[in-house]
Amino acid sequence: MPKNKGKGGKNRRRGKNENESEKRELVFKEDGQEYAQVIKMLGNGRLEAMCFDGVKRLCHIRGKLRKKVWINTSDIILVGLRDYQDNKADVILKYNADEARSLKAYGELPEHAKINETDTFGPGDDDEIQFDDIGDDDEDIDDI
């Protein structure tokens, strides 16, 4: 058999779709849409979300978002309400932490909404790491 001398298959040539770096325009809700927070991931492209109008709904992740946008619990999402089923909705968009904070600042989200803070560092976080000194004696490593 010939030796593998390539750098990978056809997926390498296609490359990754890196669209996280560009900032997108903030999308507000329209009529027939509602903001919601994910309570539980159910699998099979479905999730349980608490809409900010006070109704708990079973949401279906649409095909455009299904494998490209990963949705976790406590994420803020925009859902499209169904006219014929009040307890079901379709996920239209997932907001990242910065967009959710700006929605809260605009007054679109209620004050009690908890935004997941794991995506970005807050203003108080530093890049420095504080180490506790184990020994108080001033021994140099070269002297040992």
From Swiss-Prot:
List where Acidic residues composition bias occurs: 124-144
A single Gene Ontology molecular function, please?
translation factor activity, RNA binding
Q: Which residues form the S1-like domain?
A: 22-96
InterPro entries tied to this protein = NA-bd_OB-fold (IPR012340), RNA-binding_domain_S1_IF1 (IPR006196), TIF_eIF-1A (IPR001253), TIF_eIF-1A_CS (IPR018104)
Q: Which CDD domains match?
A: S1_IF1A
The Gene Ontology biological process terms listed for this entry are: ribosome assembly; translational initiation
Say which domain of life the source belongs to: Eukaryota
Q: Where is the composition biased (Basic residues)?
A: 1-15
Q: What is its main location?
A: cytoplasm
According to the UniProt record, one GO cellular component term is:
eukaryotic 43S preinitiation complex
Keyword set, alphabetical order: Cytoplasm, Host-virus interaction, Initiation factor, Protein biosynthesis, RNA-binding, tRNA-binding
Q: Which NCBIfam families match?
A: eIF-1A (TIGR00523)
Task of the protein: Component of the 43S pre-initiation complex (43S PIC), which binds to the mRNA cap-proximal region, scans mRNA 5'-untranslated region, and locates the initiation codon. This protein enhances formation of the cap-proximal complex. Together with EIF1, facilitates scanning, start codon recognition, promotion of the assembly of 48S complex at the initiation codon (43S PIC becomes 48S PIC after the start codon is reached), and dissociation of aberrant complexes.
Q: Which family does it belong to?
A: Belongs to the eIF-1A family.
What's this protein's name?
Eukaryotic translation initiation factor 1A, X-chromosomal
